[in-house]
Amino acid sequence: MPQCECPEPLSAVQLKRLEEHKYSAAGRSLFEPPCQIYWNWLVQQIPTWVAPNTLTTIGLVINVITTVILVYYSPTATEEVPGWAFFLSALGLFIYQSLDAIDGKQARRTNSSSALGELFDHGCDAVSTVFVAVGTCICCGIGAYPNWMFFCGFVGMFMFFCAHWQTYVSGTLRFGLVDVTEVQIAIIIMYLLTAFTGVSFWEMRVPVLGVNLQTFPILGIIGGFLYSTYNYFFVIMNGGVGKNGSTVADTSVLTPGLHIGLILTLAFIIFKKSSSHLFEHHPCLYVLTFGMVIAKISNKLVVAHMTKSELHLQDTAFIGPGLLFLNQYFNSYIDEHIVLWIAMVLSLVDLVRYCTAVCLQIASHLRIRVFSISPQGHAHKD
C-alpha cells in the first residue's frame, strides 16, 4: 500500500547552507562575568556522556511544569497561589537558566557542537519565554488589569522575536548590558519574594508615591522594552549584511515584521472584540495559546537565519488564531472558551510537530543524535 509521507520542513539547499552556518555573537551582559564562574564549575559536574540537548530539555520541562502549577492555581493571574508553588517556579527557572547556560559548554567539552545544538537552544528559549511571561504576570497579580496583562504577557515574546530578527538581518546575535540573564535573575527574586509575602503584596500602595507595588515591575518591563527595542531596530533599520543592505537571505529587512505584527494584531483584536470578555476571564490560557504561535514563528525565523533562506508568511501556526477570529466574525457561534482550547491544542501540536520534524531532519542529515552524543559528528560552534 502506498504511504502518505509529510514533506520534510527543510529543502536540500537549506540543509547545505546549514552545514556552512557559523555561530556569531557579540556583547556581554552585566551579570555574565560572575555567572561564568558558576557555569564553568557546574558544567564540570555533568558527566561527559550527557548530551547538551538533554540538559536544555530537562531544564525546559522543569520550567514548564512549575509554571503550569502556577496557572492551575491562578488561571486569571489574580488568585493567591501557595508559597511552595512560587518556590518551585523560582527553582525551575534557576535550573533552566543554569542548564541553558552550560549546554554550549558541554557541547564543546564533549566535542559535540553542531548547528542542531544552536537551533535546539534557541527553540527551547522561545518556549521558555512564553511560560516565564505567564508566570511573571501571575506572580504580580497583573491579571486584575487586562490591558497591562496583555502588554506584559506578550512584550517578552516580541523582544525575543526582535532579537532574532536583528540576527537574521545582521548575521550576529547581539547581547545587551541588561539581557536575558539579568531578567531571569530579577524574576527569580520576584518569585521568592511572592513566595514569602503572597500575591497581595504587590497590591500594597506606596505611601508617598500613591501607586501599587505592581507599578514597579511594570515600569521595569517598559524600560527593558524601550531599551531593547531601540537597540534591535537600530540594527534592523541600518541595513543588513546581504545585497543592498538586505538580510542574510537577501530578502527585505522588514519581512519578519509581517509575521509578528500579524499575530499580535490578531491577539489584540480578538482581545478587544470578544463579547464574552475571553481575555479577561482566561488570560493565562490566552497568552499561552498565542505564545505557542509566536514560539513557532520564532523558531522558523531562527531556521531561516541559519539556512539563509526566506521567511514565508503562509504558516499553519495561524490556524488557531484564525479560528478565534472567524468565530468572532460569526458572532461567536461557538463558545469562545471552547474555541480558545481548540486553538491552544492546535497551536501546541503544530509547534511540537514542526520542531520535531526539523530536529530529526537535521540530525539525520548531520548523522548525529538529538539526545545522545554520537561517536562521530559534524562540529559546528554552538
Curated annotation (Swiss-Prot):
Cofactor(s) recorded in Swiss-Prot or TrEMBL: Mg(2+); Mn(2+)
A cellular-component GO term for this protein: Golgi membrane
Entry keyword annotation includes ATP-binding: no
Bilayer topology: Multi-pass membrane protein
E.C. no: 2.7.8.2
UniProt topological domain (Cytoplasmic) ranges: 1-51, 108-114, 169-179, 238-254, 306-318, 366-382
Catalytic residues identified in the record: H122
Stretches of the chain found on the membrane's Lumenal side: 73-82, 140-149, 197-211, 271-282, 329-335
Residues involved in CDP-choline binding: N53, R108
TM ranges: 52-72, 83-107, 115-139, 150-168, 180-196, 212-237, 255-270, 283-305, 319-328, 336-365
Location relative to the cell: Golgi apparatus membrane
Binding site for Mg(2+) 1: D100, D103, D121
Keywords of the record: Golgi apparatus, Lipid biosynthesis, Lipid metabolism, Magnesium, Manganese, Membrane, Metal-binding, Phospholipid biosynthesis, Phospholipid metabolism, Transferase, Transmembrane, Transmembrane helix
GO MF: diacylglycerol cholinephosphotransferase activity; metal ion binding
A Pfam short name: CDP-OH_P_transf
Site label Increases basicity of active site His, positions: E118
Pathway as given in its UniProt record: Phospholipid metabolism; phosphatidylcholine biosynthesis; phosphatidylcholine from phosphocholine: step 2/2
Principal location class: Golgi
Family label: Belongs to the CDP-alcohol phosphatidyltransferase class-I family.
Biological function: Catalyzes the final step of de novo phosphatidylcholine (PC) synthesis, i.e. the transfer of choline phosphate from CDP-choline to the free hydroxyl of a diacylglycerol (DAG), producing a PC. It thereby plays a central role in the formation and maintenance of vesicular membranes.
Protein name, per record: Cholinephosphotransferase 1
Species in which this protein is naturally found: Danio rerio
